[in-house]
A protein has these predicted regions:
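Perimembrane helix-loop-helix junctions
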Residues: 14-15, 234-261, 336
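Interfacial juxtamembrane loops and adjacent helix segments
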Residues: 73-122
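Loop-to-helix entry region of an early transmembrane alpha helix in multi-pass inner-membrane enzymes
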Residues: 115-127, 131, 139-156
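Transmembrane-helix signature of polytopic, membrane-embedded enzymes
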Residues: 144-145, 161-183, 201
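Specific aromatic-rich, kink-prone transmembrane helix
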Residues: 160, 180, 198-217, 377-381
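Membrane-interface helix-loop-helix junctions at transmembrane boundaries of multi-pass membrane enzymes
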Residues: 167, 247-254, 329-350
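Membrane-interface alpha helices of multi-pass inner-membrane proteins
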Residues: 204-206, 216-230, 236-244, 259
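Hydrophobic, aromatic-rich transmembrane alpha-helices
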Residues: 313-343, 355
């Protein structure tokens, strides 16, 4: 049974209550700027960590190779360039970790240029990232260019998030967005030298443009996000189908999908991508040392084994499943309370959720970075219903609260 809190009995209690009331009132008046400043500090700290404490991952080598492939047509020369460039840009301990795993995959690739070159089709398809690295490498060292590109991606992602919150009038909730990013391993994505965060920033910008009805910007940004990571075609296809089924007018998103659909086949052919099944085999079943002509027969058993292994890893060591389930629970709870998204936003949220499920089904890999673009947007879409619920609770809170045992 609930009961009223006892009235302060001494000076200390009264001072504490007064201080809490003052703090609550002050924060309520300054919640928006405080939220924006707190989130900005988090973004700046993340950018600083990306620049000063970057993660030296093996994917740096093939990404640097494809960025300068035109200047080194010979496989051995390209191999030597990539490895020497990374060696000059990372610590001795990091370089040893990238090139010596006791005779395993990394040791083999450090010594066999032809096999290393055969893997590049799986990286060459990230066309936009490679071109940006190549351009930036003309004015700075290639490894430094990777780090600067990560910093730019972090800042761009943070700016778009703040802009989204500002357009909704909910900058006070910016720290909550920061908490979601922490749960979604934003820091790890920022420190990794991969195209994932660049794609996420462009993707988030495209979704904001869609929500605001800026069709041209939607088309351009979603297409650029696809060019950074072509696996975004899965989300774009689902989004386009939902828009057509529910007859939602959004030519920007449809144009972005159409352009990406055409570009997907053109880029795959140009990049000499090995294909879906060989790539899945390499990523989730077994790291094959030479992808030239590698065409393993499709096996339902091998696919299901890869699916199960990735699913177990995803729920045990990664965060994207939990973040996604929490967003779904919030969507359901708000809907049951009568605070629903409008039609346009609801279609987008459904596409984001289905996009994660479809991406994992098509290409079961457990890493959070693969699904990161889809993790924050559902929460940003739900801020409207959350604020409506908050306003409703505030209005109801003005009425006297009946406490069992009280006399009328």
């Amino acid at each position: 049974m609930l009961s009223k809190s006892p009235a302060p009995q001494n000076t200390l209690d009264r001072l504490t209550a007064a201080a809490l009331a003052w703090g609550e009132g002050t924060y309520a008046r300054w919640a928006a700027p405080v939220g924006a400043i707190a989130f900005s500090l988090y973004i700046l700290l993340t950018a600083f960590m990306a620049l000063t404490m970057p993660d030296a991952n093996w994917d740096m080598l093939p990404y640097l190779a494809i960025a300068e492939e035109g200047a080194y047509p010979d496989a051995q020369a390209l191999h030597d360039y990539a490895y020497s460039t990374v060696q000059a840009g990372v610590s001795a301990a990091d370089y040893k970790a990238l090139t010596d795993d006791g005779g395993g995959f990394r040791s083999h690739m450090a010594q066999h240029a032809a096999d290393f070159h055969s893997l590049l089709g799986m990286y060459r398809i990230k066309f936009l990232y490679a071109e940006m690295l190549s351009t930036m490498s003309s004015v700075m060292s290639p490894v430094e260019a990777m780090r600067v590109l990560q910093v730019v991606s972090v800042l761009l992602f943070g700016m778009i998030t703040l802009l989204w919150l500002r357009t909704e009038g909910v900058l006070a909730l910016a720290p909550v967005a920061g908490a979601v990013l922490i749960m979604a391993d934003f820091g790890d994505a920022a420190r990794a030298s991969t195209p994932d965060l660049l794609c996420s920033a462009l993707f988030l910008g495209g979704l904001l443009a869609y929500v605001r009805g800026r069709e041209a910007a939607t088309a351009v940004l979603l297409f650029l996000a696809f060019m950074a990571r072509p696996d975004n075609i899965v989300f774009l296809a689902i989004f386009a189908v939902l828009l057509l089924v529910f007859r939602q007018r959004a030519w920007g998103a449809l144009a972005g999908f159409a352009a990406s659909f055409v570009a997907y086949f053109a880029i795959s052919h140009w990049a000499q991508h090995p294909g879906w099944w060989p790539h899945l085999w390499f990523s989730s079943i077994e790291q094959h040392y030479n992808m030239d002509g590698f065409e393993p027969p499709f096996s339902v058993g091998a696919y299901l084994k890869a699916f199960a292994a990735s699913f177990i890893r995803a729920i045990s060591i990664n965060s994207w499943v939990g973040v996604s389930v929490l967003a779904l629970a919030a969507w359901f709870a708000l809907g049951r309370a009568g605070f629903r998204l409008d039609r346009r936003a609801g279609i987008l949220l459904a596409a984001l959720v289905l996009g994660v499920l479809a991406k994992f089904t098509v290409f079961p890999i457990h890493d959070t970075r693969i699904y990161f673009p889809n993790l924050l947007p559902p929460y940003l879409l739900l801020v409207g219903p959350v604020m409506a619920l908050w306003a409703s609770a505030s209005l109801n809170g003005r009425r006297p609260i009946a406490i069992p045992g009280d006399k009328p």
